[in-house]
Design a protein with these regions (language model features):
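Expand to "…catalyze enediolate/carbanion chemistry for C-C bond making/breaking, isomerization
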Residues: 1-172
């Protein structure tokens, strides 16, 4: 068995070549965004907004190549609220993971990235409704695009909860 690889995209040149990098080897499992180096390369701040295009481009490249997208760590170790807000943005943008640079970041990252029992139940309902054709769940339209997102939620839940021995670690 060979080790999986993660490539870090942390420069304007790397971002311009992101699709080529994503296709470089079948051992590549993920691309990780390097916010500090990217900001330095661009002459930008490390805040969310100045790097939104770069993050979005990396997530899109990962989607095209079926790789996991890993977001850069949150750098202010004293700002727990800022960390929670940023990891929520990461999830909303399509990142599958967020790097942590301190043990206090692991819990908030895991909480934001782990599907809740409610999200899992909704994903199951969406797939059941989608099997009937176009329909609605909780008043919201369901079509194949919504079903694909629901499948992703269930795949993440299955991957996370099939690896835990913790009796209270998995939603029902």
């Amino acid at each position: 068995k060979t080790a999986a690889l993660v490539a870090q995209i942390e420069s304007a040149h790397g971002l311009a070549a992101v699709d080529e990098i994503a296709a470089a080897t079948p051992r590549l499992a993920a691309l990780m965004f390097g916010a500090a180096d990217m900001a330095a390369d661009l002459g930008a701040d490390t805040a969310w907004e100045p790097l939104l295009y770069s993050r979005s481009a990396l997530v899109a490249a990962c989607a095209r190549s079926q790789l996991l997208a890993i977001d850069a760590p949150f750098f202010d170790l004293r700002d727990g609220g800022g960390l929670k807000a940023e990891v929520a943005r990461s999830v909303a943008l399509g990142f599958a993971a967020k790097c942590a640079v301190h043990p206090t970041q692991i819990g908030p990252n895991n909480s934001a990235l782990t599907p809740t029992s409610q999200a899992i139940a909704e994903a199951r309902a969406i797939l059941a409704e989608n099997a009937k054709g176009v329909g609605a769940v909780n008043g919201r339209m369901v079509d194949e695009a919504i079903a694909r997102k629901a499948r992703r939620v269930l795949a993440v839940a299955d991957a996370l909860f099939s690896r835990t021995d913790d009796a209270d670690g998995a939603p029902p």
